[in-house]
Amino acid sequence: MDMPSLEEQIELIERGCVDCISRDELVKKLKKSAETGIPLKVKAGFDPTAPDLHLGHTVLLQKLKQFQDLGHQVIFLIGDFTGMIGDPTGKSETRKALTVEQVAENAETYKKQVFKILDPEKTTVAFNSTWLSKLTAHEMIQLASELTVARMLEREDFKNRYESGKPISIHEFMYPLIQGYDSVALEADVEIGGTDQRFNVLMGRDLQRSRGQAPQVVLTLPLLEGLDGVNKMSKSLGNYIGITEDADSIYGKVLSVSDDLMFRYYELLSDLTTAEIADLRAQMEAGTLHPKEVKKQLARELTARYHSEEAAIAAEQNFENVFKKGGIPEDLPEYQVSLDEPIWLPKLLADAEMVKSTSEGRRMIKQGAVSLDGEKAVDESMLISPEGEVLIKVGKRRFVKVIFA
């Protein structure tokens, strides 16, 4: 494949970005890289506080992949040191720090998931404890001298906490400095972060400049809205699509995205070019292409990315069978169990891994989201007799056949 022109590279890199600080610096860095043959160092940092990645995280990963495809060095930085502090960005109170063991476990989970997107042969995985744990007390104090409390209180989250009398710990003030120091240690040319990280990634530019390094270009990307179309995608809000979810789940959840949000997902998640996306939008607005077909194309693309083309086709067929034909999945999962007495329905749902807990099971029953052999379950205290088989459906897409042995 021919290398895109400089203009095409800039267009690709800026696609979906909120900030590019600065474009002139980016152009100069790309030109110098092309002339010298030395790839740019492009980093994005992830604190391993929530180990399961969802599509919201992949907005940054997709941008890293674009740089990777252009021949640059991608650094996937795992903030194992900063993860033990806890990023205060956007928080109304001090976050509970993770233990060393929790951070290490979560970091390993991250590493297994990111290579669903990034090429492992072209990715450097770094841990910021490598350099941060070696900083002396003198160096830490010197680092702290480069930022004033007044500037820190310019941050909306800190300002709100200060004005409302909520405590702010000194270590939280240190977080942007420590994150910024990562760029110094890695001599980064470009850093990518969410819009909520703007203050922190700009700190990297300041620290590089004060140490005689060329300041990194900062690219900020928007926070992807979740399935509710309102709040940012978040596991805690339950509005997320996890990249390790099964193919049927990813496909079905993408189809549930609102028409208004669909092209936002295309822009931030799809590999289609800007022109191809514009063509889809034009066809849809002209009435020659139904919105559902446009959405199905995105669902196939994302399902194939995290599974395979075959899995995406099977998920689409499964969806058609379940929703349009009123059937059940062809590859219906089974759960076999041997019991001597009736089992509480919420417990059965949890045991069969249809819900994460009995409390979630009770909530789903209250919401009318559980059916047994086609009949809606309405009693959360219901006991199931351990005889024969029962087909359980939870929500719109999840089925399991329970076989009592």
UniProtKB/Swiss-Prot annotation:
Q: Which domain of life is it from?
A: Bacteria
Question: Which terms under GO biological process does the entry name?
Answer: tyrosyl-tRNA aminoacylation
Gene Ontology molecular function: ATP binding; RNA binding; tyrosine-tRNA ligase activity
Its recorded reaction(s) are: tRNA(Tyr) + L-tyrosine + ATP = L-tyrosyl-tRNA(Tyr) + AMP + diphosphate + H(+)
> Among its keywords, does the record have Nucleotide-binding?
yes
InterPro entries noted in UniProt: aa-tRNA-synth_I_CS, aa-tRNA-synth_Ic, Rossmann-like_a/b/a_fold, S4_RNA-bd, S4_RNA-bd_sf, Tyr-tRNA-ligase, Tyr-tRNA-ligase_bac-type, Tyr-tRNA-ligase_bac_2
Entry EC no(s):
6.1.1.1
Keywords, A to Z, come to:
Aminoacyl-tRNA synthetase, ATP-binding, Cytoplasm, Ligase, Nucleotide-binding, Protein biosynthesis, RNA-binding
Supply the CDD domains for this chain.
Answer: S4, TyrRS_core
The positions annotated for binding ATP are: 235
Coarsely, its chief localization is: cytoplasm
Reply yes or no: does the keyword ATP-binding apply.
Answer: yes
The record's subcellular location field reads: Cytoplasm
Q: Which HAMAP family match?
A: Tyr_tRNA_synth_type2 (MF_02007)
Q: What is the protein's name according to its record?
A: Tyrosine--tRNA ligase
Q: Which organism is it from?
A: Desulfotalea psychrophila (strain LSv54 / DSM 12343)
- Lineage of origin: Bacteria, Pseudomonadati, Thermodesulfobacteriota, Desulfobulbia, Desulfobulbales
Q: Please name the gene that encodes this protein.
A: tyrS
